[in-house]
């Protein structure tokens, strides 16, 4: 007879709480079959084995393999009644504890995964890496919780260095360290036991890669970053910072990680935190800043990394573009620190400008000197094509120009349009810089894409110049260096024509005395007056166009042709009349006694 689950009397007896071998023997004598199976495919002997009733097991199946702990201890005792009733889990625990592996696989099959998982919390097995490995290989449930509500992984993390082999066994079997506060359990235990080996740091990193929580603080309120600083684990600190932990999180004493790094004298941690955006101005519970902590312990070397007076830290992870930004402010110390933190000396900003270019353009000689000493490239151009040398020339920084030339800046580097720095200096009217560039072997005959030479650029400057001495010094410097005063640029313009305003719009303001002085200097070079631009404008046409009577007189005395006609068949006098310069037009006719210029103009107009 069987019940609804297919169990007969022998099977039910084996599953009962208290049953003696004599009862089982009596049932067998009554021909109750012992080898029938229930609805789950189990035999009576399997039920007895699961309950640890080894005397009944031997009675039901003498060939059933008994655990070594049972058979070895009672192998010489006759009869089956003396075999003890010991649950498989107990026998399994003892076998693992004493390293006796024979027969344990069969015992493991008699235990539920939850029961095997409970052994992972056993005081004698939890730290035994081999036992942990064996249990996991045979189906132990790694999510079973102990009396404190911890899974085996978290229980081991709380034990620190002594649990490392067992933790590694769990990780090898894919047990996840995920869950709030797992990492800080390990870090807190390491801090408590003063265990800060690199192997432990590597384990912490492996835990993070496998999903450990990098954010939750410890039970005492210490965040992972602060604990990592205490342990001096730089790689762990960097991992945490790069993955977004709070840089300003306070520990149980109200201190940030930067406070701790300063107080402990950990300069590498301090630099890392500064680079990752930690604030030197954060205040601890007692009101002190990291800078104050450094000064109070006499560590001025650390204080240097915390004192950003001119260029302030941006309260974020430092970027390469911060180097040019600091250079723009002229903060040499900030630039030095940024480079020492690993940022490239030739880092560029959004405009492609390097720190050297920004410092050169800003006139910060100290920053320029430091950058050059650190190996900055003096030729690195911005997106616009500007170089540090062109920036220094543009901003009239003579000393910086000299420093860049000494550092090897290419003096003939072409800017957009084929312009050289010598042309740029001439166009800006900088005789001192022009002289320095020529001394450094700048090519006075070089031309740009419009075939303009440096002397042409100086002439362009001269038309709107206000300083006669500067213009004359500029022209003297170029002419003494061998510049050709007769060279015709694109559009057939000579330096003389440009000096007279060939490229200027009519009505452009100019100082006639300054232009006259420049023309006199070119006339000293016996420049040709028989030149004209594409419009057919000669020197007198241009002087008339801009209303320059003194220049008209001087050009006429020098032999300029007053009857020369432009491309529209106009004489210089007609140009002056068209522009309304009556006094200028009068310069082209011989003076009549007693007749004013205006009267003569009105008479001739009839």
Positions of PLM-derived features:
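Ankyrin repeat domain, specifically the short helix-to-loop turn at the C-terminus of the second helix
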Residues: 25-33, 59-65, 105-112, 133-141, ...
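Conserved ankyrin/ankyrin-like repeat signature
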Residues: 19, 23, 55-56, 103, ...
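Core solenoid repeat modules with strong leucine/isoleucine-rich periodicity
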Residues: 122-126, 147-150, 154-158, 164-171, ...
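Start-of-repeat signature of ankyrin repeats
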Residues: 6, 41, 75, 88, ...
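Ankyrin-repeat-protein effector appendages
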Residues: 50, 54-98, 103-106, 110-114, ...
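Ankyrin-repeat intra-repeat helix-capping/turn positions
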Residues: 17-19, 52, 99, 127, ...
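Ankyrin repeat boundary/linker residues
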Residues: 3, 38, 72, 146, ...
């Amino acid at each position: 007879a069987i019940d609804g689950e297919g169990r007969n009397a022998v099977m039910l007896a084996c599953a009962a709480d208290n049953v003696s071998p004599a009862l089982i023997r009596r049932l067998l004598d009554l021909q109750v079959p012992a080898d029938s199976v229930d609805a789950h495919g189990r035999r009576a002997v399997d039920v007895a084995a699961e309950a640890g009733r080894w005397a009944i097991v031997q009675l039901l199946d003498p060939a059933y393999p008994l655990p070594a702990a049972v058979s070895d201890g009672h192998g010489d005792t006759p009869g089956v009644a003396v075999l003890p009733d010991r649950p498989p889990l107990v026998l399994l625990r003892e076998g693992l504890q004493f390293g006796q592996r024979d027969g344990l696989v069969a015992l493991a099959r008699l235990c539920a995964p939850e029961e095997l998982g409970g052994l992972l919390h056993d005081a004698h097995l939890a730290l035994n890496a081999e036992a942990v490995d064996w249990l996991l290989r045979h189906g132990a449930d790694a999510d079973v919780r102990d009396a404190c509500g911890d899974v085996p992984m978290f229980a081991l993390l709380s034990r620190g260095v002594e649990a490392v082999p067992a933790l590694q066994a769990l990780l090898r079997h894919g047990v996840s360290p995920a869950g709030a506060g797992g990492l800080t359990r390990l870090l807190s235990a390491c801090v408590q036991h003063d265990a800060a080996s690199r192997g432990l740091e590597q384990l912490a990193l492996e835990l993070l890669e496998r999903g450990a929580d990098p954010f939750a603080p410890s039970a005492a309120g210490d965040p992972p970053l602060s604990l990592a600083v205490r342990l001096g684990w730089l790689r762990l600190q960097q991992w945490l910072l790069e993955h977004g932990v709070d840089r300003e999180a306070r520990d149980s004493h109200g201190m940030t990680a930067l406070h701790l790094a300063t107080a402990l004298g950990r300069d590498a941690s301090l630099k890392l935190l500064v680079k990752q955006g930690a604030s030197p101005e954060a205040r601890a519970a007692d009101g002190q800043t990291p800078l104050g902590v450094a000064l109070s312990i006499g560590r001025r070397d650390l204080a240097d990394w915390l004192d950003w007076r001119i260029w302030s830290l941006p309260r974020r992870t430092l970027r390469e573009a911060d180097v040019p930004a600091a250079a723009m402010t002229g903060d040499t110390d900030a630039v030095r620190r940024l480079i020492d933190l690993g940022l490239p000396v030739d880092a560029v900003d959004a405009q492609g400008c390097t720190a050297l270019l920004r410092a050169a353009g800003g006139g910060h000689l100290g920053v320029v000197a430091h950058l050059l000493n650190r190996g900055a490239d003096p030729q690195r151009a911005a997106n616009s094509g500007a170089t540090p040398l062109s920036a220094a020339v543009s901003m009239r920084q003579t000393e910086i120009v000299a420093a860049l030339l000494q550092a090897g800046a290419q003096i003939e580097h072409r800017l957009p349009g084929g312009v050289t720095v010598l042309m740029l200096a001439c166009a800006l009217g900088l005789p001192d810089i022009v002289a320095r560039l020529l001394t450094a072997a700048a090519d006075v005959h070089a031309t740009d894409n419009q075939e303009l030479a440096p002397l042409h650029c100086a002439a362009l400057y001269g038309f709107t110049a206000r300083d006669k001495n500067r213009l004359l010094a500029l022209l003297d410097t170029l002419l003494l260096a061998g510049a050709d005063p007769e060279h015709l640029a694109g559009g057939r313009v000579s330096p003389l024509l440009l000096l007279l305003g060939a490229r200027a719009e009519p009505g452009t303001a100019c100082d006639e005395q300054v232009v006259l002085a420049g023309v006199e200097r070119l006339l000293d070079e016996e420049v040709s007056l028989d030149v004209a631009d594409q419009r057919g404008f000669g020197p007198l046409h241009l002087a008339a166009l801009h209303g320059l009577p003194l220049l008209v007189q001087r050009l006429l005395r020098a032999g300029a042709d007053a009857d020369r006609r432009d491309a529209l068949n106009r004489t210089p006098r007609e140009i002056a009349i068209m522009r309304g310069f009556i006094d200028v037009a009068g310069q082209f006719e011989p003076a009549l006694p007693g007749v004013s210029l205006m009267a003569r103009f009105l008479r001739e107009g009839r």
